[in-house]
Amino acid sequence: MTMRSKFSIDRVLHDTAFAKWCQKEESRNADSITLYTSILDFESKLKTGSPSLSLLKLARHIHRKYVSLNTGTCHVIGDSIRTKISTRVHEVLDGKPPYIDLFDPLKQPLFQHLRSMHTEFSTTTADVNTTWEDASSTSSSNKGATIWFNEDAIDKSSRHEIGQSTVTHESEDDRFSFFNAVCTRLNSLQETKNSSETEEHAESPRKEKSSTPYGTDGFAPPPRSTQTNTLKVSNLPKRFESLYKKKRQQVATSDSSGFGSNASDFWSFERYGKSNQGTLERPNRLFTGTNNGFSTLQPKRRGSEAPKMTVELRYENDVPMVAKISANHAQSVTLRYFRHLFGLHYTDNCRFFFKSTCEDGSAQYQWTLLFHDDDILPVFQNRITAICRMCPPPEDHDLI
């Protein structure tokens, strides 16, 4: 690969806008960017002498997430190349030392795909910029247009009329004159509105003063009903009955003839909010049935519970531990969530194996070893099954 190509791929890998653009459509395969970055990270760690265990974890992660024909997501690479890389990674996991060109067959197809996508991205961005520049130039060409201010279209009945005039904004004095004209016009409109409101308020008291409580027939309207404020004391519990018997109706004194007597009875009912035994009573429904305000609240109905999925963990020579989780999240359970669910701490001498479908079809299932917290746990027969094996801390010379 030439220096020019290397410079181009580095620029593409660090282009944030390009990465977001690739994520908008699945056909652009945004995982190809992450895969190329992971390959460069593997080569960098190998050159700096990182521990073999760390290199094995990274190689297995690259193979499982991006390259494998069963679980890989980078579909822009041909099946033959992916099969070749799978063979190489399995050889390294079986004991062969990691080498610098382990993932070299992937670079060329990844580079071609990224270059093609970045060319399309650059063309799309250039079209948007051209459209924006055309719109900006059209907008700027209209800045010197003449504005015609016609006050007749606003209001011809105002006391202060500016008159039809031509207003320009080419100089500071013209803009200041236009500002003063607008302010004068707005002030006159506000004064007209305030004066009309003042006249309306001045006329309204005279109308209210001439009003009479008597109708057209010469009779006063009947007193308002106080039915909504009355309660039947006999229907209340005994512990609340005394609260309503302490105060009786207090009728204001007046002469027993004419309109004054009826008015005093009405205002006493309105003031105390209750009546004597002859007043219409409220229907007896406060303390019966489900509407009783002092009864126990009805329990809420439980909705249909979501289906559950079993998660099982077993240590060697020990009984299994089981947890239930929502089946809706079965395809997104990570190793981090699994350890948090059972309260586990990952150490170098602890290995988690998960039951999954056999990749080569030679057995009914296989035990898959997971390292990274972001790895998605496999679901086998509608459940997640794991075993934990303890082993002594590995040494670099034991893995080679």
Swiss-Prot record:
What Pfam families has UniProt attached to this entry?
A: DIX
> What InterPro entries does this protein map onto?
DIX, DIX_dom_sf, RGS, RGS_sf, Ubiquitin-like_domsf
This molecule's function is given as: Works in parallel with pry-1 in negatively regulating bar-1 signaling in vulval precursor cells and Q neuroblasts. Shown to have a role in excretory cell development.
Q: What SUPFAM superfamilies does this protein's entry cite? A: Regulator of G-protein signaling, RGS, Ubiquitin-like
Which is a GO BP term held by this UniProt record? negative regulation of Wnt signaling pathway
- Please tell me what else the database record remarks about this protein: Reporter transgenes fail to show detectable expression indicating that axl-1 may be expressed at low levels.
**Which residue ranges does the record assign to the DIX domain?**
305-392
Task: Report the protein name in the record.
Answer: Axin-like protein 1
Q: How does it assemble?
A: Interacts with bar-1, dsh-2, gsk-3, and mig-5.
Q: Name one GO molecular function term.
A: protein kinase binding
Composition bias of kind Polar residues appears in 287-298
Recorded phenotype for the gene knockout or disruption: Worms exhibit defects in excretory cell development and axonal migration.
* Residue numbers spanned by region Disordered: 190-233, 278-306
Task: Please provide the record's keywords in A-Z order.
Answer: Developmental protein, Wnt signaling pathway
Bias (Basic and acidic residues) occurs at 194-210
Q: In the UniProt record, does the keyword Cell cycle occur?
A: no
